Amino acid sequence: MKKCRCGRSGCVCILVMKREYGMEKNLKREKEHTTEYVLQKAVCFRAGEFSKEEKYIVPEEKYDLYLNGEMIHTFFCSPWYLEDLAYGFLYLEGYILKSEQIKEICVKQQEHRIEVVADKECDMRRQDAKETGKKAEEKKISSKEIMSLAAALDERSHRFRLTGGVHSAALAKDGEILLMREDVGRHNAVEKLLGACVREQIDTADKTIVFSGRVAAEILEKAAAIGAPTLIAVSAPTSRAVELAEEKGILLVGFARGESFNVYTFPERLAEVI
């Protein structure tokens, strides 16, 4: 196995310099070091008969997150876009306020560690970003755009179609998906997406989050922490998520499938007159 710049085998080292890498180059670099799928032998029952087959399943691994030498969290996650997962977690939990505070990230795959070197002031947690999320700006959206984005998320979810085992979270604007993150865990998928936004300093005030899973309160809080005004979900929200969406000023859409969807908050923001 090739050694990374730190000289250690099995380590993916990312030196975070101000805007050194564009988004697509960062994605390509991490993908080269990750496992997309696992081929698993299985006994399958179909139409009254058994057969031995090989099935694709999604990888799930345990990674410990270290901040300036101290372990602060353990992830059970899919082993791709791990630097975005670290950014998202550190931002949401109040360790960092901006991407420049992180100086270096080393993803050590053999040791299952994500090591972050950050400013010393990041050693102490500040106020939880999920509790202080900005009030979302109002933004109109059409029913056509809602249905188009839900369909686009499904079309781009190739890992789900192959394995049935991942959640997807995407950032969109004007009916177009700008970036997407996937993970075996729905919370991880959202944290990876928001981490990418923090890392690339993306202004999300006029963007839409599109999500494949159920929207519970914590998912809503994580979306609100960045300030996206609209959250479109393929599945259902919970009662607490609807309450939080009202408080945070988020247009919450659920069951966005085919040519139907439900709007739970701020229906007046639909472009059509109701």
Where on the chain are the PLM-derived regions?
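Histidine/lysine/aspartate-rich catalytic loop segments that bind and position anionic ligands
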Residues: H158-I202, T208-I209
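Polybasic, lysine-rich low-complexity intrinsically disordered segments
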Residues: K2-K3, K18
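Short alpha-helix boundary/capping segments
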Residues: C77, R181-G185, P237
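Feature captures the catalytic cores and cofactor-binding loops of soluble hydro-lyases/lyases
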Residues: R186-I274
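Intrinsically disordered, low-complexity regions enriched in acidic/Ser/Thr/Pro/Gln residues
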Residues: C4-C6, C13, E24-D174, L179-M180
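Short amphipathic alpha-helical "recognition" segments used for binding
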Residues: G7, Y21-G22, E131-K134, R186, ...
